[in-house]
Amino acid sequence: MTKPLHWNHRAGALGALALALLAQSLLTQTPFALPLVDTLRVETAHLLAYGLLAAAMLLFALAAAPEPHAPAWPEPPRPQPRLALAFTWPALSLALALLGYLAGLALYLSAGESLAVRALWLAGPLLFLASYLPMRARPDRVATLPSDTWWEWALLALMTAAAFALRARYLTAIPGNIDGDITVVGREALALIGQPAWIGINTYFQFPQFFYMLSALSMRLFGQDLYGLFLGSVLIGTATIPAVFWLGRELADRRVGLLAAALLTISYTHNHLSRIVIPSAPLLIVTLFCACLWRGLRTGRGVWFALAGILFGLSPLVYYGARVAFVILPLLFLWLLIWQRRQISGQWRHWLALVFGALLAFGPMLGYALRQFDAFMGRTGTVTLTNPTVYEHLLNKYGVSTLPALLVRQIERTLLTFHLYSDTSPQFAFPGPMLDWLTAALLTLGLGLALARLRDARSFLLVTWFAASLVLGGVLTNDPPNWVHLGIVLPAVVILAAQAGVYLWSLLARPLDQYGRLALAALLVIALAAVGVNNWRTYATWSVTSVQPRTSMARFISRLPGDTQVLLVQEPFSWDDSVFQF
């Protein structure tokens, strides 16, 4: 009985992969050019592809066996009070952190931002983490992950180096077109060098000052020009590669972590988003937040909850995409409350630590947010369907007259951006889908797998991240799919795709001997390398052809001698444009 059952799983999973690849080929003619497409109307081909994608998800979900050897959920730890009244180092650190936070908040509310306010803000999270020292070695309360191996870390180091090389290559030439929003960030950040302002909301784009200060720090370290602005962003984007590996390893195993990191490394979308400053920090912060939170749940150790709280508190201080954490955390908490209530009641002190860490990291921004809530919310009300202008624009754009019809179009364009619809943002505007064909096909299967295992908190976390990002960054916003808004979903996407890839690998490798598995691994590496090379060539070629006149003029002027006089004589160009100023 066992052997036929395995073959049924294998046939079903491979059939699902074939359906996903066929659907992708119908939509974009990759990886296979189908002559059939030329005989079909575009709408017919799209509907057929949508049906095939849905069938692939369903078939893979049915073919996927229950996860083998799934670790049991951790038993709630015995209560170990941290807030004891005794004079201990943890109690003293917590008291100092709380007093420092209150003092900093009071100083800010009474006199505004100052060096003392910033020092107290920084001291709070550091003192809080210090309360967990010295770390006592306690065994994890669940089955631990496999022990580390040298090749695992060697592969991760190799991928991280490759990711940096791809993202730093031709750093000031790619992207070819520099959108005005990016140069505004550079101009505003340049003004903050020597005059730091970490608290509040910048009036130009209504982004947090903290976000601009990160760019100012980058330019102070690496140069007060486009190179200095971009390099800091590239370093943050590169750091997301090992962060995704860690999260994938925590949620599943090293194979999922490595494959997810590889898929993100070769992604042209992540390559671009890592360069253009605005979305890079949210990707790293949310990935680390989820990794710390899950490690805390898995091990029952409070320090990971504290770190998750600190990252959660930092999430509203960068670009808006990071605020998806404010959806992920409550929904996961609610899931635990319904299905694993003991993980709430038995670890309530750890959950309080998460809240306290978030409060400390958010710091004096709490005072600003309470005083100027509308400014803190930024452009939320201007770019969503709640804005009547946006609503009317979308009705006219789609030629519909009702909200349900509008939402159907919004959902289609958002959900299918991984397979078909191109970016609408001025910062990228890449003329193709968000994912390459390999990642897109694996994502389809990974979603089916995760939905079939939705009772598993790991799947629930990824599906929540995925769905919340698409709803908040696409369905409810103006002119989706805007990849600057939707980019926050990429870590969840590659982990979902990697889970499907590893499941397929397990089915194919099961009957093979050691040499057969090595050959299969070599084929996987070759496939990833081939897709990665094609992704880079496609991205670099597009970048050369995407340059707009304003950027071409600014690049030309920047290469002239410093004493050269330049006169602009034709609209719509003006020296007041940030592209020329920066």
Short names for language-model regions:
Residues 1-153, 307, 328-335, 351:
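Membrane-embedded, hydrophobic transmembrane alpha-helices
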Residues 269-281:
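Short acidic/glycine- and proline-prone juxtamembrane loop motifs at membrane-interface regions
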